[in-house]
């Protein structure tokens, strides 16, 4: 696929309340700087934050290279199953043949995607799913488990990573 990089935006998504959305809370897909901070993700039906990109189905833009997700609060996100709902935060490019992929899709540098200082208040296990990432940091986040809903998700892992390198995970 071809992407016009001169038409891609930088994104500052800050101070919002995202509540009761169907399918997902937010979707970001730009190679420029993306900052998601100080938001409340409250009962988003699908994944709260999706970093996507593909030339296979939706034909959305390409890779995310510089993403910071910080100081957000996630309350019982992922209460339903839709496309791209592998975790509360899903880094999920559409790659039909992952094992033969030559380059990583997202990131591309140490700390290309940083998830820090967030609070997850959740009834189920999956917090982060990442596929085809070079440079992922998850640090200083608080994960609290509640009993508001019965856990149901097929993904029983806090962190599920597929073809990810240069990863640092610490709660």
Question: Where does each model-flagged region fall?
Answer:
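Extracellular parallel beta-helix/beta-solenoid repeat domains
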Residues: 1-171
């Amino acid at each position: 696929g071809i992407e016009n990089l001169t038409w891609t935006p930088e994104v500052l998504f800050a101070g919002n309340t995202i509540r009761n959305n169907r399918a997902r809370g937010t979707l970001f897909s730009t190679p420029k700087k993306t900052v998601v901070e100080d938001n409340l993700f409250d009962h988003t039906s699908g994944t709260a934050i999706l970093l996507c990109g593909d030339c296979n189905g939706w034909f959305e833009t390409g890779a995310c290279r510089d993403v910071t997700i910080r100081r957000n609060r996630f309350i019982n996100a992922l209460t339903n199953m839709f496309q791209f709902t592998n975790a509360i935060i899903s880094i999920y490019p559409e790659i039909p043949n992952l094992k033969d992929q030559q380059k990583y899709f997202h990131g591309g540098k140490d700390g290309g995607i940083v998830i820090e200082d967030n609070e997850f208040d959740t009834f189920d296990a999956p917090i982060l799913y990442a596929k085809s990432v070079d440079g992922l940091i998850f640090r200083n986040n608080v994960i609290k488990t509640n009993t508001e809903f019965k856990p149901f998700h097929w993904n029983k892992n806090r962190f599920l990573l597929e073809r990810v390198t240069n990863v640092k995970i610490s709660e």
